[in-house]
Amino acid sequence: MAEITVELVSVERMLWSGQASIVTAQTTEGEIGVLPDHEPMLGQLVENGVVTIQPTDGDRLVAGVQGGFLSVSKEKVTILADFAVWAHEVDSASAEADLNSDDELAKARAEAGLRAVRRSSEGL
């Protein structure tokens, strides 16, 4: 199976680095899927978007992201997010409460996290 190297990094931490068969991301130009040997490109991630990674040796990973960029070369996909959280790390009850927060950053992060949870439960 063909594979591509993927790195998902936020301002706060490195979330994942490894080999994947496909990566999908929501960009300002729409949702894109990146397979091995994809044409090089640079994309801007949407606010409150979702990134999915299908590792070659494991279960699909889903992250909620808050802005950033996606860089694609023939051999590597690098996702640099302002904020990112794995769907399994999201406390849905707390995130739902944060949607009503006056803190815009907390609200935005909650939206990104909840979108990741929804995408993860879709099983796509």
Curated annotation (Swiss-Prot):
Q: Which GO terms describe its molecular function?
A: ATP binding; proton-transporting ATP synthase activity, rotational mechanism
User: Main localization of the protein?
Assistant: membrane
Matching Gene3D superfamilies, A to Z?
A: F0F1 ATP synthase delta/epsilon subunit, N-terminal
Entry membrane topology: Peripheral membrane protein
Q: List the disulfide bonds.
A: none
Q: Determine the domain of life of the protein's source.
A: Bacteria
Q: Where in the cell is it found?
A: Cell membrane
> Which InterPro entries does this UniProt record tie to the protein?
ATP_synth_F1_dsu/esu, ATP_synth_F1_dsu/esu_N, ATPsynth_dsu/esu_N
Alphabetically ordered keywords of this record: ATP synthesis, Cell membrane, CF(1), Hydrogen ion transport, Ion transport, Membrane, Transport
What Pfam families does the record point to?
A: ATP-synt_DE_N (PF02823)
Q: Which GO terms describe its cellular component?
A: plasma membrane; proton-transporting ATP synthase complex
The family assignment reads: Belongs to the ATPase epsilon chain family.
Share what the entry says about its subunit structure, partners included: F-type ATPases have 2 components, CF(1) - the catalytic core - and CF(0) - the membrane proton channel. CF(1) has five subunits: alpha(3), beta(3), gamma(1), delta(1), epsilon(1). CF(0) has three main subunits: a, b and c.
Q: Which NCBIfam families match?
A: ATP_synt_epsi (TIGR01216), PRK00571.2-5 (NF001852), PRK13442.1 (NF009977)
Q: What does this protein do?
A: Produces ATP from ADP in the presence of a proton gradient across the membrane.
List the protein's name: ATP synthase epsilon chain
> What organism does the record attribute this protein to?
Corynebacterium efficiens (strain DSM 44549 / YS-314 / AJ 12310 / JCM 11189 / NBRC 100395)
